[in-house]
Amino acid sequence: MAKTVQDILAIIEENDIKMVDFKMVDIHGQYRHVTIPAENFSEDTMKSGIGFDASNYGYAVVEKSDMVFIPDPDTAVVDPFCEIPTLSMTGNAMIIDSPENRPLAQYPRNIIQAAVQYMKDSGVADEMQILPEFEFYLFDDVTWQVEGRCVGATVDAKQSYWNSAVEGHGVVVPKQKNYHIAKPFDTSYECRSEMCLLMKEMGIDINYHHPEVAASGQYEIEPQLGEVVHMADATMMIKYIIHNTALKYGKSATFMPKPIYGEAGSGMHVHMLLFKDGEPVFSDDNGYSHLSETAHYFIGGLLKHIGSLCAITNPSTNSFKRLVPGFEAPVTVGYATSNRSAVIRIPAYAKSPNKRRFELRNPDATCNPYFCYAAILMAGLDGVKNRIDPHANGWGPYDMNLYKLPEEEKAKLQGLPVSLDEALDCLEKDHDYLTAGGVVPEALLKNFIAAKREECRQLSAIPHPAVFDKYYNL
């Protein structure tokens, strides 16, 4: 049941709340916030909103940057990281207009809601559920420096193999042998457990948490399936909880896809399924891997647009250092059951009709989740609309280890973009599926591409320490 203003006022009184914090997201997927004293919160706050400068969020030009933020009462939670009792809410950005404000089309939360409405209008489904997997590193120490005479970074995790020579330590994990390792080698169990308990308190149900492959402090937390807009909100809150809880334990968390060369990268695999009138759209006992024709067309849309999707689902230059062979990261455009070398995997363990689904394995958590999930939905719906058959297009199913194919066979396969610049090229050429129905504004795509091009330019101009190995003595 939806919360009302009276419900929020009751929460404020019951918890002796002193501050109300409004969390918004910028174009890159970073939380920003503005806070008001609790006594200033009223029904007018919910209607008129809180003013902010949208140009600093990447959504507007300076001369037309006044917007208002309208909180969504259903997102209200007590923030456990504030010493002063604080109620937190997220919501939507609106353009100031008369007689009524109207939604800011470029704001990512508005976009995912528009994508869901587009899905409903299409008649394909009335609900999308997703399950993003959160892989991340916890470091005990991290330093970096980017100056003219010094460019470098150093990380440390006490349980890592590189600390085997530290006197009196002894508890270390061999390289790439951290997966599901138990105590005493799992040195972050309490930290992750507290993260999950906090998520539960904030309305996010969890399946499990565990150590991931990389011995240098890599872990995973997996929530349960949930409605896509709720899970976009949850994605932001999960990252917020992980970052803040890590600091409490004297660690820092990073969702960088590839913080350490030679170690497993961190992704954010996204499982997905659709429902219509409460019935699973993707289930068919007679289909390949028990998936329906609609599910296969949805897969076809994802695979057709995977190049441009990568600009949104993997929007950092570091993202493409993860998408390389040898670390269970996808590099090939294709689908199959239980195959982690293809970009789409159908989990064999999802046997119940209400759980039959597939996962897109290339995304990572440097994305803006609202934009990411909306783009995934729009690509899939385009596949359904245009009946894009993944098998007929030569994208599988690939029921073999694609990493171990002979080179001449690998050469026949379509690969993912190898850089952010290449993915942005794809997005510039292929984005009509995103703008269909006015879901993603052209203006946002233009701003996003320009911002990411500038990132690529800046980072490519900085000499990497590894070039000294190659060129210093020539």
Q: What do the predicted segments below correspond to?
A:
Residues 2-474:
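Glycine-rich, acidic/polar active-site loops that bind/position phosphate-bearing ligands
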